[in-house]
Curated annotation (Swiss-Prot):
Record organism: Thermoanaerobacterium thermosaccharolyticum (strain ATCC 7956 / DSM 571 / NCIMB 9385 / NCA 3814 / NCTC 13789 / WDCM 00135 / 2032) (Clostridium thermosaccharolyticum)
Alphabetical GO biological process terms: D-xylose metabolic process
Cellular location(s): Cytoplasm
Quaternary structure, from the entry: Homotetramer.
GO cellular component: cytoplasm
Database matches in InterPro entries: Xyl_isomerase-like_sf, Xyl_isomerase-like_TIM-brl, Xylose_isom_bac, Xylose_isomerase
Cofactor dependency: Mg(2+)
Biological classification of the source: Bacteria, Bacillati, Bacillota, Clostridia, Thermoanaerobacterales
Gene symbol of the encoding locus: xylA
Pfam families in the record: AP_endonuc_2 (PF01261)
Family indicated by similarity: Belongs to the xylose isomerase family.
Name the UniProt record assigns to this protein: Xylose isomerase
Residues in the signal sequence: none
């Protein structure tokens, strides 16, 4: 019996000609492509925070979201209602996974002990729902940024008491993620950075960040948590300069501190653009370095300089993103988590469904186009030809390590005329459009 979303029935696939806004046009979860269903390929996940806890408040105005639990006043009653609403939502939109922060699902108490007690009550409730729901936990994480105690950071705080509290909070978050069957655990350092170097010991902060992550690895082993650890890069906001700036930055950090064997990255589209990178750039860099773990599927507004967390509807973007996932061989434990929120003016409960339908359709269509691009080898063939000079002759000597500066100088002196070929960017973009518009 519907209790929270009475106006919405189960969302079904009706095809691209459907005029029903509450139906999938391109996402058919049961459609089989290359031996796997679309549901298995895409591994969609619902973000608990944006979907069930966000209220539309911004720095200029109060809450706008109309939610069926808004009449409640007790924080625990609200938390319980959100769990009920969440699983009704998961069922109606046929979501395979969801993700959560610890403070999304249960309110903070006056003490850490009271907060953990609140978590235990809500986690027990979620476990009961998981017994009969198809929806599972993609990943869990700890909110180490909202409370004022994290004003100077969490594991990178100048205050050792905050470091200790953060460790206790992550310890509990790891325990409940394991208890709920989470397949990954994410670290996003929203406050792990600085505003000015005039008061910052960067070396100590980075060392402490690494110590913290090693402690997490050790505790995960101790409790038998076998999920994948993920770090989510973001260059700024809320901190001016965050230590997990982009994939390359994170990878250098992990390698320096001997953490690369334990961590992969969770890449968010809007974070990539804040770092002045294409989404595909971050995915490609992670893929070729073997650290692409999971994706936060959203998009930003290119005219705004902050994290807008909009639902992804650009087919070109989703195609190029899924191109990288397919080239990787698909997701293992990761997936596509909609770290996206409806706009402040899209305040009715039904808008939650409409936003997710738009995002799921966009990635389903993008996957199909990307699959055809990979299968046809469109870009691979061109790239192989473009770099053909490294297949034999002096190029082969360079790649094999046979060449050195002396031999290369000798070659250059004997071959003074260099002939380059066109990169054909415009042609390739036209081919991409051809696939986008016809597939």
């Amino acid at each position: 019996m519907s209790k929270y979303f009475e106006k919405v029935s189960k969302i079904k696939y009706e095809g691209p000609k459907s005029n029903n806004p509450y139906a999938f046009k391109f996402y058919n979860p049961e459609e089989v492509i290359d031996g796997k269903t679309m549901e298995e390929h895409l591994r969609f996940s619902i973000a608990y925070w944006h979907t069930f806890t966000a209220d539309g408040t911004d720095q200029f105005g109060k809450a706008t979201m109309q939610r069926p639990w808004n009449h409640l006043t007790d924080p625990m009653d609200i938390a319980k209602a959100r769990v009920e609403a969440a699983f009704e939502f998961f069922d109606k939109i046929n979501a395979p996974f969801f993700c959560f922060h610890d403070r999304d699902i249960a309110p903070e108490g006056d003490t850490l002990r009271e907060t953990n007690k609140n978590l235990d009550i809500i986690v027990a409730m979620i476990k009961d729902y998981l017994k009969t729901s198809k929806t599972k936990v993609l990943w869990g994480t700890a909110n180490l940024f909202s409370n004022p105690r994290f004003v100077h950071g969490a594991s990178t705080s100048c205050n050792a008491d905050v470091f200790a509290y953060s460790a206790a909070q992550v310890k509990k978050a790891l325990e409940i993620t394991k208890e709920l069957g989470g397949q990954n655990y994410v670290f996003w350092g929203g406050r792990e950075g600085y505003e000015t170097l005039l008061n910052t010991d960067m070396e100590l902060e980075l060392d402490n960040f690494a110590r913290f992550l090693h402690m997490a690895v050790d505790y995960a082993k101790e409790i038998g948590f076998e999920g994948q650890f993920l770090i989510e890069p973001k260059p700024k906001e809320p901190t001016k300069h965050q230590y997990d700036f982009d994939v390359a930055n994170v990878l250098a950090f992990l390698r320096k501190y001997d953490l690369d064997k334990y961590f992969k990255v969770n890449i968010e589209a809007n974070h990539a653009t804040l770092a002045a990178h294409d989404f595909q750039h971050e995915l490609r860099y992670a893929r070729i370095n073997g650290v692409l773990g999971s994706i936060d599927a959203n998009t930003g507004d290119m005219l705004l300089g902050w994290d807008t967390d909009q639902f992804p509807t650009d087919i070109r973007m989703t195609t190029l993103a899924m191109y990288e996932v397919i080239k990787m061989g698909g997701f293992d434990k990761g997936g596509l988590n909609f770290d996206a929120k409806v706009r402040r003016a899209s305040f009715e409960p039904e808008d939650l469904f409409l936003g997710h339908i738009a995002g799921m359709d966009a990635f389903a269509k993008g996957f199909k186009v990307a699959y055809k691009l990979v299968k046809d080898g469109v870009f691979d063939k061109f790239i192989e030809e473009r770099y053909a000079s490294y297949k034999d002759g002096i190029g082969a000597d360079i790649v094999s390590g046979k060449a050195d500066f002396k031999s290369l100088e000798k070659y250059a002196l004997e071959h003074s005329e260099i002939v380059n070929k066109s990169g054909r960017q415009e042609m390739l973009e036209s081919i991409l459009n051809q696939y986008l518009f016809t597939e």
